[in-house]
């Protein structure tokens, strides 16, 4: 499972009383976390990229980076998970003291979005072999990739959601 905003693909295993953590591998560049607890799968925040009141820090992936909301898809025929990704999307966050005002944002932060590499791509589709825990292939897009993935028994994947408004078909293998 591609985590929504952490930047890691999580491998989990069903157990009698819970869903257990097995492993995690980064699928986008991330600097906000210093590690992952091998027992629980919980990330540890890197203090160099954790905001405090009045201080600004950079962090990757941004609030829009990583997988975010679009759904990934699994194809049992190929054994691959296909993840819609926004790579190269970072941000800056500054902690602020705020006074609660009904109906307004109450985050206690000012955020902005940046590109880690202005010449690089932003959107991608990544195919991951979860048995090996590694990326098998990817397709890059110059714009964000906000579309979900659909995979078929005929070993195709379909996607949309880039700013060029194309609907794409790819070989799932």
What spans do the regions from the language model cover?
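Terminal amphipathic helices with adjacent charged low-complexity linkers/tails
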Residues: 19-23, 88-89
